[in-house]
């Protein structure tokens, strides 16, 4: 089989970003070369596609307008051999695509009808520069638009939507997606694609649970996870993109926020302050566990009365402040919060039942666990003080 090539949508359109993330997750048999998508090995691509489809949320839907459902999805379904009497779920389209490619793997791989350009799904028309938004400037010569894309590319875009969705705020009609920062570079050095996928998976794992949490909690939890995966420096690891897809006035999908997600110096502070890698990983693991318990507390605290989440919010705020300002007061405050937590647990354990129960399930005494966390955190203070002499 000769390689199959498709011209990608221009940078600045969400369609490009969703296709890129689909290619990143698929990994084998398909790649991006500059502004082209290339299927290099149909057999490997077919196996990768089947594997990814088997692991996505089967019940997830995507934003569709009435025209999308009636004309575009219906057209895709007919070409893929699906029953068009009912509405096809995204997963049904992708499963059908996988079967078509399996049958054509030794021949053309992507059949001619899948290469046909048809009107674009509304969600794939979204761009990052409309209305003068700051994150990408509007083209000076003319307003760039795309109206059509090949069916195959649109199906890859749908796959990208499914694998990058991290959450929905229903009362605002906003869906959040995690995407690699700035997309996939036109010239990616060898070996970096694997690292990009590793970081994307980490960002997805954390943002899936924390996308709606205060920034200090999200950033600290992400930094701890990255430390435990071996990351040695701070970086912008992903973009959290919010798209308005619902609400009373929403007639089409529109980008409403693009937030770079970075570790803001936390990794560097911990790694330069603590020499022993074992202590580094232990601190990251303990803070990660505490934040996970805090997440449960914040989500259910009003009902349960648990206050672990309040402690975690204050602690992570102090840590992030220290990372940004190097103010020792913030670090002292963070450790003081942990010291007082030991007293709070003794005085009223019911208010910290989530933390107590989690630790006891692991065979750990809460006060001893907190004392060890305080010891590890104190290493940051000692390192700071040593740097002054």
PLM region spans:
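Long, contiguous all-alpha helical interaction modules
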Residues: 1-99, 236-389
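Long, mid-chain structured domain cores
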Residues: 66-143
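N-terminal functional modules and adjacent low-complexity/disordered segments of proteins
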Residues: 123-126, 139, 174, 347-350, ...
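Domain-exit/linker segments immediately C-terminal to small folded modules
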Residues: 136, 140-289
């Amino acid at each position: 089989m000769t390689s199959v090539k498709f011209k990608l949508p221009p940078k600045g359109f969400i369609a490009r970003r969703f296709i890129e993330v689909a290619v990143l997750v698929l990994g084998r048999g398909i790649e991006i070369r500059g502004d082209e998508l290339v299927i290099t090995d149909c057999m490997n691509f077919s196996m990768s596609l089947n594997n990814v489809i088997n692991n996505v949320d089967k019940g997830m839907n995507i934003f569709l307008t009435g025209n999308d459902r009636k004309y575009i999805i219906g057209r895709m379904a007919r070409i893929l051999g699906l029953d068009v009497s009912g509405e096809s779920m995204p997963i049904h389209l992708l499963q059908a695509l996988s079967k078509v490619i399996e049958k054509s793997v030794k021949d053309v791989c992507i059949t001619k009808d899948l290469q046909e350009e048809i009107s674009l799904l509304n969600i794939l028309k979204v761009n990052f520069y409309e209305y003068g938004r700051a994150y990408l400037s509007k083209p000076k010569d003319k307003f760039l638009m795309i109206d059509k894309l090949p069916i195959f590319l649109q199906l890859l875009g749908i796959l990208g939507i499914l694998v990058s969705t991290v959450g929905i705020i229903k009362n605002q009609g906003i869906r959040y997606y995690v995407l690699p920062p700035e997309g996939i570079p036109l010239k990616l050095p060898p070996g970096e694609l694997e690292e990009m996928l590793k970081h994307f998976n980490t960002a997805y794992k954390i943002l899936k649970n924390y996308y709606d949490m205060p920034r200090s909690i999200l950033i600290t939890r992400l930094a701890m996870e990255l430390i435990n995966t071996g990351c040695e420096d701070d970086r912008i690891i992903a973009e959290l993109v919010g798209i308005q897809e619902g609400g009373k006035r929403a007639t089409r999908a529109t980008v409403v926020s693009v937030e770079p997600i970075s570790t803001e110096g936390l990794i560097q502070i911990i790694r330069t302050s603590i020499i022993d890698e074992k202590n580094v990983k232990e601190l990251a693991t303990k803070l990660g566990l505490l934040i996970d318990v805090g997440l449960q507390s914040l989500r259910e605290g009003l009902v349960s009365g648990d206050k672990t989440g309040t402690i975690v919010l204050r602690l992570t705020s102090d840590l992030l402040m220290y990372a940004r300002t190097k103010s020792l007061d913030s670090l002292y405050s963070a450790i003081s919060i942990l010291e007082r937590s030991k007293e709070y647990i003794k005085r009223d354990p019911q208010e910290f039942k989530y933390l107590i129960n989690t630790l006891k399930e692991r065979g750990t005494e809460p006060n001893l666990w907190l004392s060890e966390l305080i010891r590890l955190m104190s290493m940051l203070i000692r390192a700071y003080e040593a740097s002054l002499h």
